[in-house]
Amino acid sequence: MKAEQNTDAHNVDRGEIAKFEAVASRWWDLEGEFKPLHRINPLRLDWIAQHANGLFGKKVLDVGCGGGILSESMAREGANVTGLDMGAEPLQVARLHALESGVNIDYVQQTVEEHADRFAGQYDVVTCMEMLEHVPDPRSVVHACAKLVKPGGEVFFSTLNRNSKSWLMAIVGAEYILRMVPRGTHDIKKFIRPGELLNWVDETPLRERHIIGLHYNPLTNRFKLAPGVDVNYMVHTHRNITD
């Protein structure tokens, strides 16, 4: 698959793209702006691999891959990974880091909707992590992910719940008090309630299998997966073979 630039960018927020392009050079700095992503990556990788019955030999699409943190970790598990993003700078960082690390990943600058038009039913696993809250039309992304996965395949989403606790934890706490991520990273209006996400899933051939919360304890400085989806949460869906 050739890396190419999409010209049909109806579901792209240029302001969101600019935010991530501004800090792209520090994507792989373990103590930089993306430190939380590096910290949670082993948790989400293990959860994805567990519910996908392993990743070895599978064709995987990472939607909203950014600088490639999750993409690389899945490739190291033996997956054949394509990373999809609309940010030119993060993709350049991802390509260079993969080259330096000796990992083979195909990074493509394209919207998920256009990719779905060209590669429907081509992937065993689709991941869309920490991306839905950064696009104008997350429902469209969910539908595109459902189109891209093969019957019998798995699709994983993660995002932030929309409520007062999430605002306090993810914006006031993480951006202003603890300064875990840059100010302005998130917009509470773009957060997505689990019921909304699952309604979009129900409009597709996907069916919910698992939902789990991602929790941070500022006293221990540790992340964990546990029940409770008040703030960050992940959803595993499966596309039935008969659909």
Swiss-Prot record:
EC number, UniProt record: 2.1.1.222, 2.1.1.64
Keyword Methyltransferase recorded: yes
Domain of life of the source: Bacteria
Amino acids binding S-adenosyl-L-methionine: R44, G64, D85, M129
Pathway(s) this gene product operates in, as recorded in its UniProt entry: Cofactor biosynthesis; ubiquinone biosynthesis
InterPro entries on file: SAM-dependent_MTases_sf, UbiG_MeTrfase
Keywords assigned by UniProt, alphabetized: Methyltransferase, S-adenosyl-L-methionine, Transferase, Ubiquinone biosynthesis
One Pfam family of this chain: Methyltransf_23
GO biological process: methylation
Top enzyme class: transferase
Gene Ontology molecular function: 2-polyprenyl-6-hydroxyphenol methylase activity; 3-demethylubiquinol 3-O-methyltransferase activity; polyprenyldihydroxybenzoate methyltransferase activity
Keyword Ubl conjugation recorded: no
Coiled coil: none
Reactions catalysed, as given in the entry: a 3-demethylubiquinol + S-adenosyl-L-methionine = a ubiquinol + S-adenosyl-L-homocysteine + H(+); a 3-(all-trans-polyprenyl)benzene-1,2-diol + S-adenosyl-L-methionine = a 2-methoxy-6-(all-trans-polyprenyl)phenol + S-adenosyl-L-homocysteine + H(+)
HAMAP family noted in UniProt: UbiG
Function: O-methyltransferase that catalyzes the 2 O-methylation steps in the ubiquinone biosynthetic pathway.
Recorded family membership: Belongs to the methyltransferase superfamily. UbiG/COQ3 family.
UniProt-listed NCBIfam families: UbiG
Protein name as annotated: Ubiquinone biosynthesis O-methyltransferase
